[in-house]
Amino acid sequence: MKNFNLILVIGATASGKTRLGVELARQLEGEIISADSRQVYKGLDIGSGKDLAEYGEVPHHLIDIVEPGHEYNAFQFQQDFFEAFTYIESRNKQPILVGGTGLYVDAVVSGYEFVQLDKDLALRAELDLQPLEQVQKLLLELDAAQYEKTDLTVRPRLYRAIEIAKNKQTNPKPAKALPEIRPLYFGIQWDRKVLRKRIKTRLKERFEQGMVEEVQGLLDNGVSHEQLEYYGLEYRFVSQYIAGQIGYEEMFDRLNTAICQYAKRQETWFRRIEKHGGKIHWLQGSGDIYQQACEVLADLG
């Protein structure tokens, strides 16, 4: 048995993830699962960077599966992912996850247990008064397995994990077992200045392709400005431009800056993967990333 059953292609926005995922799928008889929180929506094409033509003959999953206006979340993604993953594996094909949205990837690899549970405001107020180390210790005592899955540096996530652990004690029931994921991470790395240039170039291309018209079409079809805020940076800023809140140049500059800031936050997420024991095989974007990935696969046997 090979030591991985899921290839993950990660990297900052505009790093070339889809292209690498497609090339690997062709080489390995694979199928792509998108881990992008916006590409699930029909009609969110240019702003979400679907690039469907790039897939060619390669089968892809979790793209264009819900209508705009539906609030799709990480719990639904986890369910849909494992359905696609099981289907791909059952046909002896290689699943390749291309992402994307950090929470979605975490939901798959970490096997988050999603629970429909209200916040315990009294408990949270009590935990607010305790040192972080004491809160971490409480979670460890309640549920060691949940402790291992949780980002221990973020209080809201710790609080949620404690709420889930306490709920398990009072309402024990067997969780639905999720398939085991053995990940192989490929990360695409660019010099920061080069990445910023790629982001700006891609943004210009998206406006030339009709991103403003795409957002106007969504509004015309009943998607509200408030819902567009939920669909991420491109839709948020273009919506503000259409509403007359900002001019075109200001919209472009602010959007470009916001995307670059988002790329920096993605780097923080990559470091967290490594901090928690994930091995990322970094590929240099300035070189032939496909060839670099093939060399890693050859070394792994």
Swiss-Prot record:
Cofactor or coenzyme needed: Mg(2+)
Q: What Gene3D superfamilies does the entry give?
A: P-loop containing nucleotide triphosphate hydrolases (3.40.50.300)
One molecular function GO term is: ATP binding
Segments for region (Interaction with substrate tRNA): 36-39
Residue(s) at site: Interaction with substrate tRNA: 101
Instruction: Spell out the protein name for this chain.
Output: tRNA dimethylallyltransferase 2
InterPro entries hit by this protein? Dimethylallyltransferase, IPT, P-loop_NTPase
Q: Where are the transmembrane segments?
A: none
Q: What keywords would UniProt list here?
A: ATP-binding, Magnesium, Nucleotide-binding, Transferase, tRNA processing
Species annotation? Shewanella sediminis (strain HAW-EB3)
Q: What class of enzyme is it?
A: transferase
Q: Which GO terms describe its biological process?
A: tRNA modification
Enumerate the catalysed reactions: adenosine(37) in tRNA + dimethylallyl diphosphate = N(6)-dimethylallyladenosine(37) in tRNA + diphosphate
Q: Which residues does substrate bind?
A: 13-18
Query: Could you describe the subunit structure of this protein?
Result: Monomer.
Q: Where does ATP bind?
A: 11-18
Provide the E.C. number(s) assigned to this enzyme. 2.5.1.75
Can you tell me which family this protein belongs to? Belongs to the IPP transferase family.
Quote the function comment for this protein: Catalyzes the transfer of a dimethylallyl group onto the adenine at position 37 in tRNAs that read codons beginning with uridine, leading to the formation of N6-(dimethylallyl)adenosine (i(6)A).
